[in-house]
Amino acid sequence: MFEIKARDAMGRLGVITINGKKIETPTIMPVIHPNPKKQTVSMDLINKLADVVITNSYITYTTPELREIAETKGIHELIDFKNVVVTDSGSFQLSVYGDVNVGPMEIIDFQEKIGVDVGTILDIPTGPDVSREKAESDLLETFKRAKDSIKRRKEMGYKLALNGTIQGSKYLDLRQKSAEVMGKMDFDIYPIGAVVPLMEDYRYREVAEVILNSKMHLPTNKPVHLFGCGHPMLFALSVALGCDLFDSAAYALYAKNGRYLTAEGTLHLEDMKDLKSFPCTCKVCSEYTPKQLFNLEEKEKTRLLAEHNLYVTFEEIDRIKNAIKEGNLWELVEERCRSHPKLLNGLRVISKYMDFIEKHDPVSKKSGFFYTGYESMDRPEIYRHKQRLERIQYDKIYVTSVSENTSKPYHENLSNVPCDVDVLIKDSVFGLVPLNIDTMYPLAQNEVPDLYDFEKKYNNEFVSEFREKHTEKILDISTYNYYINHYGKKKDCDKINPDIFRIGKMLEYQYGAKILDDELMGKVKSRRSKNTGRIRNLLLEKEVLFTLRANDNFLIPAKYGAELLHEKLEFPNYRIVIDSSVEEFARAGKSVYSKFVKDCDHELRPFEEVLIVNSDDDLLAYGTTILNGQELMEFDYGVAATLRGGIKK
């Protein structure tokens, strides 16, 4: 069972529950050697740091003394780990040696027998440089084994969860096919396999595309494991692309070669020995100088270096979790991807997939938008803004430029004449910013440095396309000046209240429909904050309809605002339909759980304001969705939406 608690980009801070044990994602599974004598780092440290580990059931199976202990006392006792134990099935050995001495069903039976929490099918790992024919043949065999493994578990009543590995080599259509076929089977976790050769060759562009083409066709309610990814420099990007789990033997393997892991890359202990101190404050790096560690006996040096590598690996995972909570994962990704040019290639290629990524990215975040480089132009916040500009119902449009020194929000720093013309400011980062919505996230909640000329020109084509699309509504400067002069001479009773006009446009941008019709425009009133002077509420006959949330200026409905949205928005827009059995809980303002969602607006994005209705479209409650439209239909565990209030009968 998998539940999302917080999110940013496609990264998910979640909880996986297996056999009553909980794993917080994203996380790393240290690779544990099933033979305790060959384990580099003590299990006391592993138990302290990790919720989950991965070990090899094939080595256990083929080593008589290990097999005997595992079969009599269980895998947890063998490796001395009490929480979740995942096992590989021998696929790695198959990829290295070309053959294994165990059958697909035999290894499933063994993993169940030794009490594994999550087992793995004996799939066929297919490297990146094989022919297409070979990749297709291997994939068909993996499908057969996967189907047989699921059948075996069901027929035998096995309790172990199962990994269903996605294969397909470097062929993206085969990765898509693999995800589609495997995704329809009842697997619990979906590892993306055979990417280690790509990572070893720094082919991060291909790694990113393999992840995305797999994710696009996998069920959203199951965790995704990036098999063999153990270097912390790749974690942030992989999490942002939707990977929840990683496994690492790198902490030990790198230590044996004297390699010192950091979140930005790999250093060599020999090259560091003349430094006064380490660039790390973990227990090992605090107790030893580089020279002291380098001069230790080889076995002890390897152990301590492996401990550092493990510490820094978990430190990066914790940093990513915090970035998800704070809403600045993209900034961390951009920082990490600048640590190596090949990793930057991985970041740049994802712009091709922004239509997919945007569906999973929250509509609002705790942190503002920080522009850290040219790649920031392709972030989902900007992509979404450009799409949602078309939601606004324009009558007359005037497009203009402002000085680079003009502070945001623009409308507070320009001598703009209030009228019913939509004034759009050309913006180097966001393309076009309508003055009437310029306080909404992320249009005012951003920090951008001085840009190079080529960056300033990035959105020229977008602006030209917008002008061409709306050419009949575009006013030139002469027409605009004439119009505002004429408008200014109107009697006050004939003029539109600029605050109400502004709120109307904000509602169109946020909800995709005209919420304030002409009749309502004349009845509603705005209320400004006494402290800031900014619009704070929209009221109708002294009842609050909407409150403008201070941090992002989104319009948050109160009870009467929810009823107005329900009246103005066509079904199923901005709705979550729930089962009749929990109607009263919704009316009482209780959270909506995923298993009770019957239908929804499939275009919902995470953290949008939603209406909770029954199958007859009766309004029951209103609140905020945690999940997007696809997830609402696929998740069957955890909270789907938190409620702000219920509607009593």
Swiss-Prot record:
GO molecular function: pentosyltransferase activity; RNA binding; zinc ion binding
Residues given in the record as substrate binding sites: 123, 194
CDD domains xrefs: PUA_archaeosine_TGT
Keyword Glycosyltransferase: yes
UniProt keyword annotation of Transport present: no
Coiled coil segments of this chain: none
EC number: 2.4.2.48
Active-site residues per Swiss-Prot or TrEMBL entry: 88
Cross-referenced Pfam families: PUA (PF01472), TGT (PF01702), TGT_C2 (PF14810)
Catalytic activity from the UniProt record: guanosine(15) in tRNA + 7-cyano-7-deazaguanine = 7-cyano-7-carbaguanosine(15) in tRNA + guanine
Pathway: tRNA modification; archaeosine-tRNA biosynthesis
InterPro entries assigned to the protein according to its UniProt record, in alphabetical order: ArchSynthase1/Queuine_TRR, ArcTGT_C1_sf, PUA, PUA-like_sf, PUA_sf, TGT-like_sf, TGT_C2, TGT_C2_sf
Binding-site list for Zn(2+): 280, 282, 285
Cofactor: Zn(2+)
Protein role: Exchanges the guanine residue with 7-cyano-7-deazaguanine (preQ0) at position 15 in the dihydrouridine loop (D-loop) of archaeal tRNAs.
Matching PANTHER family: QUEUINE TRNA-RIBOSYLTRANSFERASE
HAMAP family assigned to the protein according to its UniProt record, in alphabetical order: TgtA_arch (MF_01634)
Family statement: Belongs to the archaeosine tRNA-ribosyltransferase family.
Protein's name according to its UniProt entry: tRNA-guanine(15) transglycosylase
